[in-house]
Amino acid sequence: MTRQRTQHVHFLGIGGSGLSPLAQIHLAGGGKVSGSDAEDSPRVATLRARGVPVRVGPAPAAEKIAAELAGVDVVVASSALAEDHPEIVAARSLGLAVRRRSEWLPELTAGYRLVAVAGSHGKSTTSAMLTLVLRAAGLDPTAVIGAEVSQLGGNALAGSGDLFVLESDEYGGAFAGLEPTIAVITNVEWEHPDIFPDEASVRTAFTAFARRVRPGGRLVVCGDDPGVAAVLAELHRQGTPAAAPVLDYGFGTDRRWRAVDVATVAGDDTARAVVLHGGQEIGTLTLAVPGRHSLLNALAVLAVATELGVAPAQTLATLATYTGAARRFEFVGFWRAGTPDPAVPAAAGAAAAPPVRRDPATAAAAATTAPIGPPDSPPPTGIALPRAAPPAVDAPVAATPAPAAGPDHAAALPAPAGALASRSPTGPATAVADPVGEWSLEIIDDYAHHPTEIRLTLAAARARTHGRALWAVLQPHTYSRFAALLDGFATAFADADRVYVTDIYAARETDDLGRHPTDLVERLVGPAVVGYVPWPELVDRLAADVRDTLSGPVPAQAGGILLLTLGAGTITTVGPRLLAALDEPAAG
């Protein structure tokens, strides 16, 4: 049922991940769409290509805003815009209805069987997997997802069926007005400290969301998650409606949907498990995306799809084809320092390679479609850790002094210039054949910006390093999150060999908390080498360190490097820029 839409809706912040799919759905239903955004972006380009007029840049004078709003029925404003934003003020002065995203979603989803996928982490992946499964089953859903999914052609899908899959965010109460037929809660953890003062307030929001399931609906939850357990306990205390029975999933022995015999293979991106439903084996789940958390997301999809009439065997088959979403453990490219010296024996199975190999399509697309530049606010003038010889190139990030090696610290000694410290007191990992190739750098980009997300992402990466060093580059996202979750960030990088922390991406905030990236550098537990690098220097520093580590007849890290860029801001531009920098001759 493609709903017919007749209103002219003007979206403020139309290029954002929250509003761009809503604009596409409204447009697909026959409605008229226009909008504005502070920055140009691929999403803006997509909308313009479909005939949507979009003004990019700062808000103009009131007279011009009024002209842009002529004929508009409703203005939908991003939650990132303050009430005193000139375009919101102008719209109200013209007597137009101004709605936030949270207020528009019930209107957009009315008349559908709504599957609302909520949770502190994993929403985008779960929503994308579920949409792919439902489409393959011929149910032709409409969907709004918080990430670009190449298999779906973007972050929105306008289907003809009566199902609507909606990634449902707790931020700003975005899911508060929904009435889902099926509600999914992947996990519940303290996040968005700018609006949730503590974990209890987050749980209160999810409890209210869970109680909004329609009569005859279902509540699908991860039974292994302690935050979910707290929400269920509160629902029980309040009296859970019989109309919304709870279906749980996880690794626990008493889960209705359970994964057992979990297997991950070093150097392999796949995750596998045997799936039990009600204690009965229904098949093997194989995913082309890594990590135990991916298996949990897939279990949620199995539970929902089965309730909607899709056979588990068909769901398993479709899940095996899922290739991932943008910025979710996304391959950026790889670079090879050069063909190894024939006098130096390579690890068994390693093949000779041309001097440079990379993924030009991925790198070029990211370089041209993502904004390149510093974070929203000027980088703070913090303490840059000292650099050591040789003078021709920057030395690796200086090591932070660490206590004696023990269960919480990888090594007591700082890394020497041009070398990588051992991950353990017993010495470096044994070099083995690298699936990408020795003397190589592989770059993965991930949206992880919460300690739990970082921990899970690095665990998945560590399982596939295959003899390579694991480097993590973090751009903290928002001052409030960085300050509130600093202790969590400090212990989230235990799987990394080296950590670079750059300037905080401000997003919608101003710096009034007095925190700096060096606060994290001083607290990091686990990695042997850590350091703060100002944003303007980051790519040059990484390029120098990569060359220094991989170059020479006997590289300091012969197995290669797996480098992860982590964060929700402009850090996604670093991978393509680093590949470009490595293509240039080294200074000398």
Swiss-Prot record:
Localization per record: Cytoplasm
Bias type Low complexity, positions: 344-371, 382-411
Primary localisation category: cytoplasm
GO MF, one example: UDP-N-acetylmuramate-L-alanine ligase activity
Residue ranges of the TM segments: none
EC annotation from Swiss-Prot or TrEMBL: 6.3.2.8
Enzyme class: ligase
Keyword Nucleotidyltransferase found: no
Keywords associated with the record: ATP-binding, Cell cycle, Cell division, Cell shape, Cell wall biogenesis/degradation, Cytoplasm, Ligase, Nucleotide-binding, Peptidoglycan synthesis
SUPFAM superfamilies: MurCD N-terminal domain (SSF51984), MurD-like peptide ligases, catalytic domain (SSF53623), MurD-like peptide ligases, peptide-binding domain (SSF53244)
Catalytic activity: UDP-N-acetyl-alpha-D-muramate + L-alanine + ATP = UDP-N-acetyl-alpha-D-muramoyl-L-alanine + ADP + phosphate + H(+)
GO biological process: cell division; cell wall organization; peptidoglycan biosynthetic process; regulation of cell shape
GO cellular component, one term: cytoplasm
Residues the record lists as binding ATP: G119, S120, H121, G122, K123, S124, T125
Family recorded in the similarity comment: Belongs to the MurCDEF family.
Function of the molecule: Cell wall formation.
Protein name from the UniProt record: UDP-N-acetylmuramate--L-alanine ligase
Species of origin: Frankia alni (strain DSM 45986 / CECT 9034 / ACN14a)
